[in-house]
């Protein structure tokens, strides 16, 4: 029997986003999961079909091959295939993490059911940091203060008020999970009384309210690498929220935001700046000082430089955090028009303008070209 189109299997269009594909798969997996349909061969086949479609369309390379060649591009039994297909349910828990763990009683890393309290990885934390362009370019070491959980000094981490005890949950008898019948099938879910801990605290600690920990602040050392760009994140492993029931802690992600600079604009590893010069320097040329992140450099402006001209200073940008190569600095020329002139200065400019126009296109090539275009426009 010919295979159905993977997009048709998931019920999405060929232009569906990764998020839409994932949502469609989750919906079908929930509907046809074997735990919900224990005696249905049809449901099992539909589940496998949906899983195979998701494995192909969620992988960029496999999806590209399928879009171009169809099933021939990904079938291991055909030339050019990627060699992937639906084989059992091994990738199911990995694809969904703990989303189905609470529904079907599966631990976060496998399908063991009814085996006591589950361990969960702690949540990741995000810390937003604003730095200057100079700090981003050169890198530096700094300290940040982030929320942190400490052991409660009142109950010493037990969660129970001193003098009382922690008891085995009377609902799940320490298993952390209970069986619930819904219609024609039975599911395992997290115990609603102990929330999967398997323990029950009749008299919670008055300070930490049964958590066994209290929130505080922790100082961390953070190394900002040279060349870091807007929106990049630095991971500090193990400094997120603590795990549950002995699970590993999450990570802390420091998200970098760069302040606007008064002189430079950044474009990747390149820098841009506007450089005002006088009319005289633009006409006759001359040396000017150009600012860079490493200090001032001397640049020779060629004579006859026009407004809007851009000069490129190689290697005067930012050394990329990934590439290791320095970008360039682009200097955009802005010719300043003199203001608040004296009468003597005005007269000198009139004489200069007259002498320039007597030379025609020899002195003002752009103006002469524009005048020629206007004449042609009105004479046509």
Swiss-Prot record:
Binds 2 Zn(2+) ions per monomer. Zn(2+) 2 binds at residues 169, 172, 191, 194. InterPro entries: DnaJ (IPR012724), DnaJ_C (IPR002939), DnaJ_domain (IPR001623), DnaJ_domain_CS (IPR018253), HSP40/DnaJ_pept-bd (IPR008971), HSP_DnaJ_Cys-rich_dom (IPR001305), HSP_DnaJ_Cys-rich_dom_sf (IPR036410), J_dom_sf (IPR036869). It is found in: Cytoplasm. The keyword Metal-binding applies. SMART domains: DnaJ (SM00271). Residues 5-70 form the J domain. One of its GO terms (biological process) is response to heat. It holds the Pfam family DnaJ_CXXCXGXG. A zinc finger (CR-type) spans 139-217. Keywords: Chaperone, Cytoplasm, DNA replication, Metal-binding, Repeat, Stress response, Zinc, Zinc-finger. Its cofactor is Zn(2+). Zn(2+) 1 binds at residues 152, 155, 205, 208. CDD domains: DnaJ, DnaJ_C, DnaJ_zf. Disulfide bonds: none annotated. Belongs to the DnaJ family. Homodimer. This is Chaperone protein DnaJ. It comes from Ralstonia nicotianae (strain ATCC BAA-1114 / GMI1000).
